[in-house]
Amino acid sequence: MADITMLILTDHDWFREQFAKLDDLQAQTPVDQRALERVWRPLADKLDVHAYIEEKIFYPQLLKRGTDDAEGETLDAIGDHNDIRDGVRDANAAAIATDEWWAAVGRTRLANDDHMGEEEREGLADFRRHAPIGLREALGRQYREFMAQHPTTKGLSIVDRDPESYVEEQEGATRSPRKDFSLGIGSLKGE
């Protein structure tokens, strides 16, 4: 079973391949709008679904397990995801193959390329070094199942998140309210 870090890397490779296909299609004369749609639609959906599931299962665990500035890595990643979502949204609002569409696709690609490079160097590497393989594989199963169930964004709330609020929510979720205020050292009566 592949661990989550390997599945994320596999998605990153797929994203790069799809953007390369768009390069090839852009070079063709005349531009084939239907071919662009066949590449863009699944790419746009997967970019959004990929960010969604990372925010649901990967980044909360990175905040718990990471030690190499996991909070900074997460803040940056959520901001990057917002930039990617904005680019996808802008491209989806424009007519395919127009200058406006290509500009939005270009912004999406740039934001995604920056994010993937940082994530590969920082968050994924940190998680591999500090999270046990069993956890990475369990998260990999969840990730794979979710991606298989959601080939599109249908039914998912694809929204920008405030990075600082996201981190605060995740860190708050890991702290349970204390019910026992003892020192946790046992009885002092010698029993």
Question: Where do the language-model regions lie?
Answer:
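Small-residue-biased structural context
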Residues: 1-191
